Amino acid sequence: VVVENGIAAIMDVAGFNYRPHLYQYAYDKLPQQIILGSETASTVSSRGVYKFPVTRQSMKKYDDHQSSSYDVEHCGWSNLPEDDWLWHNDKSWAIGEFVWTGFDYLGEPTPYYTDWPSHSSLFGIVDLAGLPKDRFYLYRSHWNKDVETLHILPHWNWEGREGEVTPVFVYTNYPSAELFINGKSQGKRTKDMSVTVENSADSTSMANFKRQQRY
């Protein structure tokens, strides 16, 4: 609306909340030709809680009122961190973001709005106790190249999942990582720089975590 009515055109910088899918449209329309993510992500997660199967979910609810720390769940209006980063990396006019949010806080327990006794948000990169969630290391690996980041999840010893395949995620600012279990290589992954904001926007790419493969 603010693009069409001219309000965004008179601002020094046009900011968009949870609208990366409108960035190109706004860039083509606005005279400033710079776009800021003034509120982004709202990925939800609970520190140390991992849900299976690992699938991208919107407004997913569980009986324990938690969200998966695999960092693949978000709100109906929001997205995952990589959805924003692709714009910043691929388009020089997408100048950055303010992530919602740094710390969990009391209130807005999305997606458990009406589910007693939920009362804490799940948006935070850091939890209510000030302890980093897995997502903290994802952001650090992307934002802070001066600090070595090599973070693996979930827990290494998963009682009750014997004989099952447990997905392993690694957040690192190294170009590649290799996973070893009991001294045996399980394979090596290299960041896929061929993934772009344009070739990863379809539903199949989203479901297959194509965007995550770049980071």
Predicted regions and their residues:
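Extended substrate-binding grooves/exosites of carbohydrate-active enzymes
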Residues: 1-193, 197-214
